[in-house]
């Protein structure tokens, strides 16, 4: 749809008293594909940081420091891979390679500053964006028992605290507004949307969604 048409439809929905939210794996500062659309709130970083509007934070959950120590030890002793460390105000990456640059171009994502991996333990980290393959995932995640991976791209996965996902963020938003789960509808297309599609009153998979998501959705 044309951006003006999207905005008009969204305004019509909100004028009817329906609240509209974004649930994303991205940091609020790098959400760059919404144009001038306005939302009632944002579930960002796969549920780790939730906003009312763009300014009021109502929920935060960070990766345990011990998990970051485990990650550093794994990279020092076994194998290295690029990893973006997402903090409240900024993010950094331990190093770049061909895959990271490809993803940054594909997603129009600003290339993070490069810092030593030990910087990760000096300030709270909400989420990791880890550039390892599906074949590497099992062995790497075994070294991070405090975390779980939510993959929506073959080149990288989001890593969040165990039990952290978009549905947790949705629950925080619903509690804030006093909305029941049965009154909700969620749309998604990626693997990290599965929890919120399952949890919503009505879960809808987009036509381009992966098969796992389509199988648990109420509608496609």
What do these predicted ranges mean?
Residues 1-9:
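Single conserved hydrophobic/aromatic residue that forms the stacking wall/gate
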Residues 10-34, 46, 86, 126-131, ...:
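Substrate-recognition element of Asp-dependent hydrolases with the DxDx(T/V) motif
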Residues 21, 43, 185-187, 204:
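Hydrophobic/aromatic beta-strand patches that form the interior of the parallel beta-sheet core
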Residues 26-43, 133-148:
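Substrate-recognition/cap helix-loop segment adjacent to the acidic, metal-dependent catalytic center
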Residues 35-54, 123-124, 216-217:
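Structural recognition of alpha->loop->beta junctions
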Residues 43-45, 55-69:
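Glycine/small-residue-rich loop that forms an oxyanion/phosphate-binding "nest" at active or ligand-binding sites
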Residues 74, 79-187, 191-199, 208:
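Conserved acidic, metal-coordinating active-site core of Asp-based
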Residues 199, 204-220:
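Asp-based, Mg2+/Mn2+-dependent phosphohydrolase catalytic module
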């Amino acid at each position: 749809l044309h951006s003006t048409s999207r905005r008009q439809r969204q305004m019509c929905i909100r004028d009817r008293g329906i609240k509209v939210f974004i649930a994303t794996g991205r940091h609020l500062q790098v959400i760059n594909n919404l144009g001038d659309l306005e939302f009632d709130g944002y579930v960002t970083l796969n549920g780790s940081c939730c906003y009312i509007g763009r300014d009021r934070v109502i929920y935060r959950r960070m990766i345990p420091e011990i998990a970051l120590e485990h990650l550093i030890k794994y990279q020092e002793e076994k194998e290295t891979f690029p990893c973006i460390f997402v903090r409240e105000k900024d993010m950094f990456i331990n190093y770049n390679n061909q895959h990271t640059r490809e993803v940054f171009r594909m997603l129009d994502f600003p290339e993070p500053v490069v810092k030593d991996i030990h910087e990760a333990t000096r300030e709270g980290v909400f989420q990791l964006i880890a550039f390892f393959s599906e074949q590497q995932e099992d062995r790497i995640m075994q070294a991070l028992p405090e975390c779980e991976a939510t993959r929506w791209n073959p080149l990288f996965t989001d890593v969040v605290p165990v039990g952290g996902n978009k549905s947790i963020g949705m629950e925080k938003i619903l509690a804030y507004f006093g909305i029941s789960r049965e009154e909700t509808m969620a749309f998604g297309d990626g693997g990290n949307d599965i929890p919120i599609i399952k949890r919503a009153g009505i879960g809808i998979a987009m036509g381009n969604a992966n098969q796992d998501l389509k199988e648990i959705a109420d509608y496609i």
